[in-house]
Amino acid sequence: MGKEKTHVNVVVIGHVDSGKSTTTGHLIYKCGGIDKRTIEKFEKEAAELGKGSFKYAWVLDKLKAERERGITIDIALWKFETPKYNVTVIDAPGHRDFIKNMITGTSQADCAILIIAGGTGEFEAGISKDGQTREHALLAFTLGVRQLIVAINKMDTTKWSQDRYNEIVKEVSGFIKKIGFNPKSVPFVPISGWHGDNMLDESTNMPWFKGWNKETKAGSKTGKTLLEAIDAIEPPVRPSDKPLRLPLQDVYKIGGIGTVPVGRVETGTIKAGMVVNFAPAAVTTEVKSVEMHHETLTEGLPGDNVGFNVKNVSVKDIRRGNVCSDSKNDPAKESASFTAQVIILNHPGQISAGYAPVLDCHTAHIACKFSELIEKIDRRSEKMEDSPKFVKSGDSAIVKMVPSKPMCVEAYTDYPPLGRFAVRDMRQTVAVGVIKAVEKVDKAGKVTKAAAKASKK
């Protein structure tokens, strides 16, 4: 057994008819998780139903249908491999689900693959002012996805036209640049998800295509196929390499043990003997022990739901929504204010400065005031407007926000799980956002005896 491949998550986005299912199905079918038995079963059913042209979308339709009926689908079916990576496909089915999943972080994508239909009229429909193509790409960027691959699909229906391909590349480069992606770092690949051209193997139908290239910090990369473009994704920084961030879900008082905060390690690691700090409570103390499922852990890793015992801290000092961090390694601090990119999803009216809804960010649930609308992008006209008077559904805006009581959040680029939030009002999610920058409060807090002793060691 060699070393296990790095895992990456990709989200496949694009207009409903762009051929997302066929393309994704093709990759999964050829490089991945569907075992031969399942495929034979599907092929037999397809033939019986007269879908003899059994193509890859059918695989996906079957998987989706089974998933919707509540049959638990072996999630391995949504995986495929490239030479370097184990890839998990995050399906972006319903628009609302997609947004919700991306925000709650059930699915943090490392890269988005934007599938564009190259056929005459189709591309224009997808990209028109209200097309999903634009909106999905804007959402992916707003939600922190910084790597993009553009696959121009259905090239077979354009008679493999180089002119059509170039026209689309030019148009798409323009709109993704407006959103914030750098087109030079985005591979563009002309494909046919149906026939398989440039999917895994170089197409013989497009001799004019000399290959894609993308510029990265590490230098430029080139390739011919969609699979190679996926293999050229920059590897994500694993959360265990970052400093500790552990948002508290609850704090218990356990007889004979003392105060036990509980929460999920989002980044970094936690272990006994560590001197931790809680923000915004500004309490510093030593971790005596770490447990998961009633067993002692030597260290808690990202994704672990742990309980840990802290000395000399009362249950009154810390609470749900506080963030635990390593006092010696970029400790978390209270946020005085922060600027965020916010997308208004469904709000019946106009939102102007002064609006103060509740924000759900990690485990914190706190009202925050939209203190200043800095700029907005109208999603239909794509116009930028500085200091707008108001924003409405469909707008994307940069907003300065001020929490109504002490809160600890982080910039999305530093600590993704602490940098995205949902805005709740009228019992629904009216907006979602990603934090760009945080103004932090420096304040001396309470240091327990245990912490003082531990830090002298």
UniProtKB/Swiss-Prot annotation:
Gene3D superfamilies: P-loop containing nucleotide triphosphate hydrolases (3.40.50.300), Translation factors (2.40.30.10). Keywords: Cytoplasm, Elongation factor, GTP-binding, Methylation, Nucleotide-binding, Protein biosynthesis. Residues 5-240 form the tr-type G domain. The modification N6-methyllysine is found at K3, K30, K316, K389. The modification N,N,N-trimethylglycine is found at G2. It is found in: Cytoplasm. Its main location: cytoplasm. It holds the Pfam family GTP-eEF1A_C. The modification N6,N6-dimethyllysine is found at K3, K316. Residues 91-94 are annotated as: G3. NCBIfam families: EF-1_alpha (TIGR00483), PRK12317.1 (NF008969). This protein promotes the GTP-dependent binding of aminoacyl-tRNA to the A-site of ribosomes during protein biosynthesis. Belongs to the TRAFAC class translation factor GTPase superfamily. Classic translation factor GTPase family. EF-Tu/EF-1A subfamily. This is Elongation factor 1-alpha. It comes from Mucor circinelloides f. lusitanicus. The lineage of its organism: Eukaryota, Fungi, Fungi incertae sedis, Mucoromycota, Mucoromycotina.
